[in-house]
Amino acid sequence: MGALITYYCLRSLFENISPEYPLVAFYNQTNKKKIPILYWENSIGRDKHSDIVVDSPMASRNHAVFCRRNEGWIISDTNSKCGVLLNGEKISKSETVYIDDVVEIGGEEYKLSKSEILGKNNVRPLKAHAYSNSSILVLISIFGFLAALVLCFSSGSFNYNPMIIFGLLFSVSWISYFVTAFIFKRVNFEIELLGIFLSSIGILTLGGVDMGEAYTQIAALGIGIIFFNLILFMIREPDLAMRLRPYIAIMAVILLIINLVFGKVKNGSQNWIMIGHFSFQPSELVKVAFIFFGTSTLQGIQTTKNLTGFIIFSGICMGALILMGDFGTASVFFITFILISFMRSGNIRTVFLICAAAAIGFLFIMKFKPYIITRFSAWRHVWEHINDTGYQQTRVLTYAASGGLLGLGLGKGCLKYIFAAPSDLVFGMLCEEWGLILAVIILFSIAFLGIYSRKASVKSRSAFYSIAACCASGMIVFQMIMNVFGVVDILPLTGVTLPFVSQGGSSLISVWGLLAFIKASDERTYALRR
């Protein structure tokens, strides 16, 4: 059933990526050619990689940006040599372009016209969903009920607490669906379905270890879904999101400072803030801010050529994480930094320079903090350290193998008695209790978020959504790789959580925040309503 749910969710996601129909067209009045406008944001210039290439020596490599906003089509000069003329008048800022208006770029005149395809079909075909969202949610509910029922009898006698967990999960899931469908009136719910499915597996797995922690995780799921919708609201307009970026960065830096001053050391890292009996990790929320501040609209990319502000912000974030001793999360930030830098600059040399600087920085840290090397002493040699530094990985490998393809049954595993089993080692618990088949399905589900983001980003309403979706999914996928490869001794064990599934309220809230960026890249999120 888990495979069926994943298949329906992913197929519905991929089938709803709309084909590239032209929105409008530019008619070149010099050579009489019609240039289709395929995207919501289009670069114009002499550069061969521009969306609209102007073959004129008078044009700048990056001359202008032509984009669609609520008020219509907008053209903006991006500090070009000879400027942009609209109906014979030079523009000094962004101006609205209407049908039959003439734009002059580099001596070439382009007349905006309606797309012939749009004229014939009236509107681009865009399906609401390939499968009924409510039907998939019913399947997820049945899956959760059966898993909770197994957990009720896992101890040998009937325990009703797992049914309470299921009831709460059922309520959170269906309330989220009804709010999305009938209050926000969105037609797409597939991303949320996948998130709910993966989160439910994590919460039910945790229920077999500690019921109290499972209730806390459900509360985190509810907060995460609210956070998800808040992010969607904040980035509903790319220009609004751009104005919010500096404030988001300031809030993130304040969180990191609070963490450095008041943070408590837990499991070797000073990244926990304690409030009474509750604790949370500010660095998890900073992940969302990192994506938010790092991305940009096409106009912002073309007019601001350097990455100085983002580099400084990234240095503050990663420096703070290193001071806290959280090298796993610092690695996740670094990979995401490379992704954002490449997507914003498109320059491979920039990436190589960043990696070289990082390598030098790593050697510098090793020189002044040599104790860090001891954390990697068992890497690739865990069976030689079975009772000390390799204790956790050897137990994961042993108990995961005992689960076979179908698992021992929820709550019947032995790995749950090992320290950090439901958080850092949760992949081993999935293999032992749920079976290797479902564990691999979960990994493929997370990995396909990255593939989907890449495909959907081409049709996004703005480069802001494209960059944010690709980098958010990249962060999630890399975090998954570090967690899974760490517990099976392919990579060093860093304490990075498995997205959606691992115990940790801060982590769950954060990953739902990242999921909002992927959701925003779906053209239907803001364009279609019930």
Predicted regions span which residues?
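Hydrophobic alpha-helical segments of polytopic membrane proteins
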Residues: 304-323, 327-367
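Loop-to-helix entry and N-terminal half of a specific, functionally important transmembrane alpha helix
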Residues: 456-495, 501
